[in-house]
Amino acid sequence: WKRYNVNTVRTCHYPQQERFYELCDEYGIYVIDEANIESHGMGYDLRVGGTLGNNPLFMNAHLDRTMNMYERDKNHPSVIIWSLGNEAGNGLNFYVTYNTLKTLDSRPIQYERALLEWNTDIYCPMYASPSYLEKYARNKEMTRPLILCEYAHAMGNSLGNFQDYWDIIEKYPILQGGCIWDWVDQGFAAKTDDDRKYWTYGGDYGENGTPSDGNFCINGVVYPDRSVKPQTEEMGKVYQNIKFLDFDKQTSTVKIRNDFSFTNLDKYDFYYIIRDHGKEVYRGKIENIHAAPGKTVTTGFLNGIPKEKQTTGDVRIEFYAAIKTAEPFLPAGTVIAREQTYVHTFY
């Protein structure tokens, strides 16, 4: 997660084992802790006897599962938000679980099926479009932060327009991000007749017509063995908290914006690479970058390219930010932000 700029996990759709929270405490991952309540098969009909969320017969079950989560996990600093459950309708039982948690704890509570009702502190829709997010953000009557509890369903090329989401999210403070559905592909390793490895899914087992979910289980941003996919790289790039902006070829300057909340940019090494038709022709350091959270600095970065390295071909310049000192899971030199700009001719 850290390597690819992920800072939050939602424990959909039930609490995780205790060791998970200890690791999140240690490594600095925000947790949206979700109660073990998921009953969308019963529908969302608010009439009594419809959705279980509004059925008094199930009130104790809702309370029990919510309180089990709270009592076990309440002392973990990584838990910053409580989630009442997932796709289980709304109604009396969730009004009660919300009020009960509020009497015990000051942390925010979210619940997707509450939509814009009162029993959620965060508006947390699923799979809202970028245009919908902007419409919400521009509506002055909307005061609750919006966090997409699920978005960018990572099947196929789902993350192909991921930047479109974050262009909007970063534009409006009321938009606070989201949780990609989901993290890891669920598949088994197998080999072809010529001994090449591949990942299987529904339809690869049993006779034709055997019930399965097809490829609906291959929807993560990493492979089943946790190796990276193209989507992983796209996610890490879009999520990066260091932005390289407004490169000026004439003055050899670039703006560097710090989107971190707590970290100064002096903990990173900055450098650039110039490529001609993909081949590296020059690299250099960008020295003495200091920018507090939320601040932007403009810096010069070229002391002149040696004459024999000058080029007039298909030229691109790449900027990088890398960790100076090793951190847990992140060796020194790990690149956590990058940008590429088309230059064409350079000097």
What is each of the regions a protein language model found here?
Residues W1-K255, D259-D266, Y271-R283:
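Extended substrate-binding grooves/exosites of carbohydrate-active enzymes
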Residues Y268-D314, E318-A332:
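Intrinsically disordered, low-complexity Pro/Gly/Ser/Thr-rich segments with frequent PxxP/GP/PP motifs
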Residues A326-Y347:
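Short beta-strand elements
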